[in-house]
Amino acid sequence: MIARLAGRIAEKRDDHAIVDVGGVGYLVHVSQLSLASLPPPGEPAALRVYTHVREDALDLYGFATEDEEAVFRALIDVKGVGPRAAQNILSGIEARELAQAVAQGDVARLTKVQGIGKKTAERLVVELKDKLVALARAAGPARAGAEADVLDQLRTALLNLGYRPPQAEGVAEALRDSAEGRPLDELLREALKRLRG
């Protein structure tokens, strides 16, 4: 099984990236959030990988963060949620936010995500509440202070520039660790560089 890929980004598409590892291009399905956090083609990158083996195919699903991979693995354990559906869900909501919504039983928040109806949201809460509690605790209460403000401003700026919500959320999440103490214009320049890559 393939658990990690490190190489150069050869291509970025709507729902996948091609990672060139030693001259071999691996097609890796990724969420919009992970896709937005990947560097431009030609740049080095590493992805955590889930290998899905079917009778007629072998599919790779990639994740920019450990949290996203953990939530993906939990989602595919839920009856009726396969790898593609899990990836689509994670394109609409950040992994820790999903974990918090599940832990709080927030069905209304979950149903705002494309691909999650009321019955699926209720099933997620019932089946995943215990599995995602540690991740929800790690997410803690809402992000504090200036970091939250500048990331919210960054998302708003990207949306105003015409980027889709998953793209804005993905790049903001990718910049979270380096956001503290940085001005919005600097973060926006870095976000645009990543998105245009």
From Swiss-Prot:
InterPro entries: DNA_helicase_Holl-junc_RuvA_I, Hlx-hairpin-Hlx_DNA-bd_motif, NA-bd_OB-fold, RuvA, RuvA_2-like, RuvA_C, RuvA_C_sf. Residues 146-197 are annotated as: Domain III. The keyword DNA-binding applies. Residues 141-145 are annotated as: Flexible linker. Residues 1-64 are annotated as: Domain I. One of its GO terms (biological process) is DNA recombination. It comes from the Bacteria. Its main location: cytoplasm. Transmembrane segments: none annotated. The lineage of its organism: Bacteria, Pseudomonadati, Myxococcota, Myxococcia, Myxococcales. The RuvA-RuvB-RuvC complex processes Holliday junction (HJ) DNA during genetic recombination and DNA repair, while the RuvA-RuvB complex plays an important role in the rescue of blocked DNA replication forks via replication fork reversal (RFR). RuvA specifically binds to HJ cruciform DNA, conferring on it an open structure. The RuvB hexamer acts as an ATP-dependent pump, pulling dsDNA into and through the RuvAB complex. HJ branch migration allows RuvC to scan DNA until it finds its consensus sequence, where it cleaves and resolves the cruciform DNA. Keywords: Cytoplasm, DNA damage, DNA recombination, DNA repair, DNA-binding. The gene is ruvA. Has three domains with a flexible linker between the domains II and III and assumes an 'L' shape. Domain III is highly mobile and contacts RuvB. Residues 65-141 are annotated as: Domain II. Belongs to the RuvA family. NCBIfam families: ruvA (TIGR00084). It is found in: Cytoplasm. One of its GO terms (molecular function) is four-way junction DNA binding. It holds the Pfam family RuvA_C. This is Holliday junction branch migration complex subunit RuvA. GO terms for cellular component: cytoplasm; Holliday junction helicase complex; Holliday junction resolvase complex. Homotetramer. Forms an RuvA(8)-RuvB(12)-Holliday junction (HJ) complex. HJ DNA is sandwiched between 2 RuvA tetramers; dsDNA enters through RuvA and exits via RuvB. An RuvB hexamer assembles on each DNA strand where it exits the tetramer. Each RuvB hexamer is contacted by two RuvA subunits (via domain III) on 2 adjacent RuvB subunits; this complex drives branch migration. In the full resolvosome a probable DNA-RuvA(4)-RuvB(12)-RuvC(2) complex forms which resolves the HJ.
